[in-house]
Amino acid sequence: MTDMKTADSLSVPNRRVIIGSIAASIAFVMELTLVPLLLPGIQEQFALSIGQLAWVFNSYGISVAIGVLLGGLLGDVYKATRVFAAGVICFATGAAIVAFAGSYELMIFGRVLQGFGGGVFSPLIPLLLTRSSPHRPGKVLIIWGSVAGYVAAFAPFFYGNTLAENGWTYAFVIIGIVSLVALAIVWSARLDDRPPSFDRSLSSYAELLKSGRLWVMLIYVFCTYGSITYFLFRLPLWLADNGFQVASIGFTLSVMWLSFSVVSTFLRNLVDEPHVRMILMSAPLLIAAGFPIAYVYPEYAGLIVSSILVGSGLACSNAPSTQLILKFAPRGMGAASASLDITCARLGGVVTVALLAQSVLAYSFVLVVGLSFVAFTCALVAAKKFD
């Protein structure tokens, strides 16, 4: 009973770190979900070509990829809260520059700075969360994931129906304010999070490369997130080609994100070690089942079922994979491993979309099933000891 009480109770500083970290994640997710909605307004205001607009979108993603690697490296060497603070400040400053940019060039600079900052602090979020809740790391990670999912589902709908008429700049102002509030909450905890004095020479990074089970989980992330990213990319285009209206497409994607959040909430008390393997194996099965349903039953009901299955698969993949990646990381390499987690997820999406963007849907489903099989095998191998 005493052990259970210790596991469920958190100190005030730890609670603040958890709340602040999740708030920072909300700002990060708002950027991902709102910016596609804002692109037409940005294009109109600055009279941009499609190529220039693509740079507005892609400059952020490229900077995130660079920032993630640096954030993971620095988070293992210096205090995670300080590195987190530096990333959030860059992110918020970049958002402000974008909001008040008077030229295309200044906007690109703001997007680069914002993306770099987001890349620096984003891999530290799971690290701060698990350090603040060491007895129930899986629970806090799944709460984080479910909150992010609800924000992803409702942010575009809320902004589009309340503030969109006032222009696109308000979105970046709100994103910047939310990130700074998150930083204030984390900083007020005054957490002493000095990294353990482990060896971080080249040999320690060699240990990272030698961690077989860690890399098995990274392959799992590559395959599952690659499949899900392709679903998010391909489904709206396919629906538009088949005469579906924008509102119907948006609703279908919202169903996917809501399914992710609801299932994540349901799993929050099941995600720790006794159930990890079962949950991990469920993810690729759900993803593989969701894709052909959208193809075989293209009616609206079939698309909703498909979105529910893929969203549920994302929930079953998200927190457990992060939990095991941090668990399998060599001592003192937690932040570096978290950055590899994010990098593999993004790389899986980029590679899968690049390979399948112009393929026939039937062929793409075959490859998705293949990726799901690889992910299922990885789950069997990596979580073997949790039977």
Residue ranges and their predicted role:
Residues H135-G138, I142-W187:
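Helix-loop-helix hairpin linking two adjacent transmembrane segments in secondary transporters
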Residues F328-L361:
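A late C-terminal transmembrane helix in Major Facilitator Superfamily
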Residues G94, E105-Q114, A301-L309:
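Paired small-residue
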Residues A47, K79, F100-L106, G117, ...:
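Helix-breaking motifs and short loop linkers at transmembrane-helix boundaries and internal kinks
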Residues R16-I50, G71, F231-P236:
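Extracytoplasmic
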Residues V68-K79, V262-H275:
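Helix-to-loop junctions at the C-terminal end of transmembrane segments
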Residues G110-A148:
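Cytoplasmic helix-loop-helix junction between adjacent transmembrane helices
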Residues A65-G102:
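Conserved MFS/SLC helix-loop-helix module at the cytosolic interface between two early adjacent transmembrane helices
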